[in-house]
């Protein structure tokens, strides 16, 4: 038995200078797991609650001492003495103890940090790397895949202080044969994009996720700049590199009049018009994945978008599904989107995260493992992507150590599997829904 002997919570700082929760889980035998909760900027209304103190005298009200206290007191008392290898039981104890639908008592940030730290401690006690232990928990022991990166190289929306409405413009190095080659391609395009922007007299300051955040005349301009950078790097757009976007449409949807108001370029669309606007962009550029292409509450709009684009474009639900199996189940039944974005802290525990990935895969949806805009050096999502063979990961651009930490962990995992004589396949474009 991998007995839990001590649980410690603390307040640390994330990549935006805001506090977050870090947890340590100690086991008999000296095994320790350490994990931190991430934090989002554009958040779905149905996400599990991130508990903040609201004390304006500390961190402008964003302190997490209440969540930390929950870790050090109620949660610690409930799980000390339990077997860390019973991940589902540990998570359920915390969920039941919290007693709310959205984890608002302790905070999803408290529960998640402990959940992940527990998994890391349990993996250590079994002498397994985290990705291998996650595969065991997932019921797919020994089945691994390296993920195709979706690299956010131009940031807009809530992730940047510029006039670009669409939140993320991403590249996917689909022509690569390995994860390491994919990262090299991504880095080369990123550096060439800096040259393209500088030549146009534009800013090369970066946003929350490490992508550039220039002011541009339109969203199409962002895609044109990326196209130029891809070609400048010596690659063929549509063959070596494909494009993806996160619209984060809820951020510019006007609930009062039902219009999508893109103030950056002075355009306003109905739900169906916005789908056709995106359709035109897909005709002009090899965009193979669109995330949150409608407001989270506009299910009628999502159904229409899925009908129009779903046979050839991966339509990812982030704010739409918030990593929640109840909401995802309803979406699957109604034919809404064809992919889910997976964010640990939207649901608040490893067990529930694995359940969402399984439900998606069983329904023929893809699952894209994702960071948040507020991150730490914690690289657990890299192990999650490999251990569930999810096939795709979204963890930012080729700058900012909080993003690169995940890529470097993927490099280590890929190398370790190769050395063991069990290399994990890199799926390339096949990982993307509608592109196999």
From Swiss-Prot:
Upper taxonomic lineage: Bacteria, Pseudomonadati, Pseudomonadota, Gammaproteobacteria, Pasteurellales
Active site (record annotation): 209, 343
TM helices/strands, residue ranges: none
Subunit structure: Component of the RNA degradosome, a multiprotein complex involved in RNA processing and mRNA degradation.
Binding sites annotated in the UniProt record for (2R)-2-phosphoglycerate: 167, 343, 372-373, 394
Domain of life: Bacteria
Subcellular compartments: Cytoplasm; Secreted; Cell surface
Family: Belongs to the enolase family.
Cofactor requirements of the protein: Mg(2+)
Functional summary from the UniProt entry: Catalyzes the reversible conversion of 2-phosphoglycerate (2-PG) into phosphoenolpyruvate (PEP). It is essential for the degradation of carbohydrates via glycolysis.
PROSITE patterns: ENOLASE
Reactions listed under catalytic activity: (2R)-2-phosphoglycerate = phosphoenolpyruvate + H2O
Protein name: Enolase
